[in-house]
Amino acid sequence: MSTDRGRINPRRRGFLTGLGAAGAAGAMLAGFGIEPALAQAIAAAGRSGKKLKAAYSNAGLQATWCAQGKQAAEYWGKLFNVSVTWFDGELSAPKQRSAIDDMASQKWDFAAIQAFGEGTLTQPVQKMINAGIPVIDMDTLIAPLDKIDVHTFIAPDNIFMGAAVTEALVNAIGGEGNIIMTQGALGHSGAQGRAKGFFSVVKNYPKIKVLDTSPADWDVAKTARLWEDLLTRFPKIDAAYFHNDDMA
């Protein structure tokens, strides 16, 4: 693995540490309806004295969650004195790879990336790491953490989420019936975790029948086409688990 992380400018390292702490606190407080003035006070603790340039990318702005992530990054960027440039993944591994190749050809104080698929961005991300640019891996693995030396990896517990949602669905239908799981992108480590959580629960219910587990790649149009077919093929569907809100 690269050891370039040790070359990070001390001022930038301190900012990234503050960003993680203040950003996590701010996101949590925002969830409780905290006023913007308080968010600004929180951000002031980690604000950079020097204007920083950051590159961001997520799977695709067509997804509501990703669009909200962009809005959040730009909002906190203003508070932390960071200029945010966005590289849209467009819910396409090849298109995101092209965007990240472009990102890697430029200089940044740091980059934050949510990959559409694991292993699709390794080369350009490694190029940035080798150039001394700290890369924050968000939500899904860019590559296994023993294969690429990202600055940090931030993700929810997708297995737990998948299991919790599935348990609620199974309880709602009385522990028996027909269920469908519509997955996100199969190469997305978050989707993989949600599927693991799903199967860890349904295996305990012998009267549950899984009718279909096709992916729809987080895409609303693909989901609609898939479900037009599913509703024709299966006259009795008791529950459905979708890997994100938009598909549901």
Where in the sequence are the language-model features?
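N-terminal secretory signal peptides
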Residues: 1-11, 21-38
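Residue-level recognition of beta-strand->loop/alpha-helix junctions
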Residues: 58, 86-90, 114, 139, ...
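Short beta-strand elements in bilobed, periplasmic/extracellular small-molecule ligand-binding domains
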Residues: 79-89, 204-216, 220
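Hydrophobic alpha-helical
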Residues: 115-130, 198, 212, 216-248
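Flexible loop/hinge segments that line or gate small-molecule binding clefts
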Residues: 119-160, 171, 178, 184
